[in-house]
UniProtKB/Swiss-Prot annotation:
Pfam families: Pept_tRNA_hydro. NCBIfam families: pth (TIGR00447). It comes from Dehalococcoides mccartyi (strain CBDB1). The record marks 9 as: Discriminates between blocked and unblocked aminoacyl-tRNA. GO terms for biological process: protein quality control for misfolded or incompletely synthesized proteins; rescue of stalled ribosome. This is Peptidyl-tRNA hydrolase.
Amino acid sequence: MKLIIGLGNPGKEYSGNRHNVGFQCLSRFAKENHISFDKKCCLSRTGSGRINDEEIVLAKPQTYMNLSGKAVNQLLRRYNLKATDIIVVQDDLDLPAGKLRLRLGGSAGGHNGVSSIITDIGTKEFIRLKIGIGKPDARNNGAEVVDHVLGNFGGEEREIIETAIARAAEALACLITSGLDTASNRFNC
């Protein structure tokens, strides 16, 4: 079984934010695989299904981003899974908008949702699918970063992200069916 967690903030006011590309990717992946988020469990909206022979659970934590680890920890215990059984779909400021990167482990890279997961489950050894959202303009002080991640995508940027979300959903399917090495070789750009 694989547990796929999309990171984001709950609520309609956040749905189009850069910080919510994890939720957006999971929504697309769920739709393509006829999975609905029809359950509430472990501080999350969840749905389950199968990809080939692999059972999967999709989860969108309903905590705010900075508390995502609480939901992930509960989900791991509920399904009796290890950190190596999870895939976290997240936004990444350090990647140009639309770029994807799959990797196992590593630091949180300044992402508070990932930091919360690492703290609450006690390890950083889980797979991440990072979707680039780019950095705010030149000066990179705290207020600009917050405004950037909580801002919505505009015009041309929105088109780039829609394409990236579609590719990220493909990457998830490839990751589940063919493994990290194959998916990384195909989708890391």
